[in-house]
């Protein structure tokens, strides 16, 4: 090597040694929300919404059409009224417009809203894996949402809808995972295998005293202890199983608890369940913002026949107050997004962020307010606006992580700075 080459080599070493070291990228972890209330608060969530682009219904005549939970039998979300509102199967309209439950931007928006409102986790309204109707899409969407819960810092569990097996049986469509005919009990047992392996194995699955929590919206299909013994035979240790209020007896020793729900007697019914009803098992409280169903106008029968008006946030204040003042440790919020029954906590054109802001205040959420909830919508809008910009999406990834870490001021700087 000649002297000139040596000089260049030494210069290269010197420049390399003097180059500034790249700062390692900060790893941002989710942070738990601090609240005055020590009760666990879980949000009941529907995962059944489909758009024309995402509807993969097993029946070809529904493919490429809006999902039935946006349309029922009378509505068309493509029809927009003079106020810019979609014609959906509800008297209330999500701020985002009608959406696909598996949309990653919708999922991020919804989970961050729950987190910043003081919600500890999600109770997924869950169907069967029976490959009929829209059931496979609900499972797909649930899996998509669940996969993002840890990143945001939310726990979750499953609420099983055994009535869907009854519905499939009424049409002779109960099958196993390979689409071979099987019994209703066998179908439910196979569902429990999937729930055990896919969900209960996750580190953020909700447990009570060390055992996984499982709820049922009923029972409405299986009414004997022997049936539930068989259904639960897949578990090495049986889950802590809650049924609807007053419905646990048919399950025998398999049921350890009951949860309250929405009924026409409203607060009187909640008070009776919390304070008067003598029950040796566990109880779970509930709170809801109202109940106004769309079924009759949607062409799905004659409707429920009663309603509970929202009255602003008055109904929520009434029901949440009863739950917080009870001696029960868990509150289920009913619901995040059952638009057909008008029970949604999700921000709408009609109510804005009212229900989540009220939830923040009543739970005593610290260092967060309604402006932080609105930031979630700003993030969602930015995701959509800059969908084709990988550079901007990377910035929004950081903003999302900061929000999950409760560093909302920093996230706001990123989002507000995008248009500058």
Residue ranges and their predicted role:
Residues 16-17:
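C-terminal motif of bacterial Sec signal peptides marking the signal peptidase cleavage site
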Residues 26-420:
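Glycan-processing catalytic domains of CAZymes
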Residues 10-13:
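Short, linear, compositionally biased motifs with a strong N-terminal bias
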């Amino acid at each position: 090597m000649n002297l000139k080459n040596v000089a260049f080599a030494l210069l290269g070493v010197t420049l390399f040694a003097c180059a500034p070291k790249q700062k390692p990228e900060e790893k941002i972890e989710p942070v738990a929300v601090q609240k005055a209330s020590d009760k666990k608060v879980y949000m009941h969530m529907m995962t059944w919404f489909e758009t024309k682009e995402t509807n993969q219904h097993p029946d070809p005549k529904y493919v490429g059409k809006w999902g039935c939970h946006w349309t029922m039998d009378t509505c068309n979300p493509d029809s927009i009224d003079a106020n810019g509102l979609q014609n959906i199967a509800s008297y209330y309209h999500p701020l985002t417009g009608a959406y696909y439950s598996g949309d990653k931007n919708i999922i991020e928006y919804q989970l961050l809203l729950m987190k910043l409102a003081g919600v500890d986790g999600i109770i997924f309204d869950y169907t069967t894996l029976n490959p009929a109707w829209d059931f496979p899409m609900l499972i797909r969407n649930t899996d998509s949402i669940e996969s993002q819960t840890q990143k945001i810092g939310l726990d979750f569990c499953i609420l099983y809808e055994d009535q869907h097996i009854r519905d499939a049986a009424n049409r002779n469509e109960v099958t196993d995972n390979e689409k071979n005919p099987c019994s209703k009990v066998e179908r439910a047992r196979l569902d429990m295998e999937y729930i055990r392996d896919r969900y209960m194995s996750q580190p953020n699955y909700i447990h009570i005293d060390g055992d996984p929590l499982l709820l049922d919206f009923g029972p409405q299909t299986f009414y004997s202890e022997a049936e539930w013994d068989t259904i639960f035979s897949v578990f090495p240790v049986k889950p802590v199983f809650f049924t609807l209020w007053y419905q646990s007896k048919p399950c025998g020793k398999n049921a350890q608890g009951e949860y309250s729900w929405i009924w026409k007697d409203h607060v009187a019914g909640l008070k009776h369940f919390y304070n008067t009803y003598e029950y040796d098992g566990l109880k779970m409280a509930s709170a809801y913002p109202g109940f106004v169903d769309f079924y009759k106008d949607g062409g799905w029968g004659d409707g429920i026949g009663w309603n509970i008006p929202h009255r602003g946030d008055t109904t929520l204040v009434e029901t949440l107050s009863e739950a917080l003042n009870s001696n029960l440790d868990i509150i289920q919020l009913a619901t995040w997004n059952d638009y057909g029954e008008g029970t949604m906590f999700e921000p709408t054109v009609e109510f804005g962020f009212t229900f989540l802001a009220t939830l923040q205040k009543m739970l005593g959420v610290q260092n967060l307010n309604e402006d932080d909830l609105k930031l979630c919508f700003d993030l969602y809008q930015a995701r959509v606006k800059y969908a084709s910009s990988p550079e901007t999406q990377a910035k929004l990834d950081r903003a999302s992580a900061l929000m999950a870490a409760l560093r909302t001021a920093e996230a706001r700087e990123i989002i507000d700075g995008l248009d500058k």
